[in-house]
Amino acid sequence: MCRLLVDDGYIVTGTTRKPERVEALASLGVRPVVVDVFDSDLLRSAVVAAKPDVVVHQLTDLPPGLDPKLMPEARARNARLREIGTRNLVSAATAAHAKHFVAQSIAFAYAPGAMPYDEAAPLNVATADEAAALTARAVASLEQQVLDGPFIATVLRYGRLYGPGTGFETPQGGGPVHVDAAADAARRAIRLERPGVFNVAEEDGTVCGASARAALDWNPAFRIG
């Protein structure tokens, strides 16, 4: 996504928790900032200093390839990131008077029901599966916090990511999306300033991505290069 935005002429400030990732961000033409999203004061200062028109929330904390042995702890970390991290980032964006907020969500937290799932389908917050409920409740919290913010709010429910850097070279499970196409959806959301919630996934009968295709002129076949 950073590469697409820089190529489009945007001035991009990218955050990372780890100083060793600064060089990689800079190589993409991004202005790197080292900050922990859980440090609300430092985060607010960093975002205000960047003077953003748009804040893009792509924060996750998951192991490479979604290693099953590491996923129980990762789910808890990711849920905390979606809840508290989102709260801090929304607060920082508000303090910076950002015009638009784009947030990454997921298109695989729906409650079992008729498929393909569209954006009106309920999330799986009431399931007896503790792991699934933890994820769904955190997703619901993230989305509601963003939608309640004082800015144009766009929530992109990504399908199951595959492609370079994801740990999966081919689609895994229902409702996949290539990482390049996901990045392009974010770019289009930024450019078009479309508010709302959009499924961003390939059509395989699991998830309906018609809203993103119509509102964002998005094509799941998009690839960089």
Predicted stretch roles:
Residues R17-A26, V30-I84:
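NAD(P)H-binding glycine-rich loop region in Rossmannoid oxidoreductase-like domains
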Residues L161-G165, Q172-F198, E202-E203:
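Alpha-helical substrate-binding/gating segment
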Residues M1-I11:
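N-terminal Rossmann NAD(P)H-binding glycine-rich loop of SDR-like oxidoreductase domains
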Residues T13, V33, T154:
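Conserved beta-strand positions in the Rossmann-like core of class I SAM-dependent methyltransferases
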Residues V22, V197, E202-G225:
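Conserved C-terminal active-site "lid" loop/helix of NAD(P)H-dependent oxidoreductases
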Residues L66-E130:
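Conserved Rossmann-fold NAD(P)-dependent oxidoreductase catalytic core, especially the SDR/UDP-sugar
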Residues F38, L81-I84, A133, R137, ...:
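Residue-level signal for the nucleotide or nucleotide-sugar donor/cofactor binding architecture
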Residues H100, Q104-F108, A128-E130, V139-P164:
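Conserved beta-loop-beta element that borders a ligand/cofactor-binding pocket
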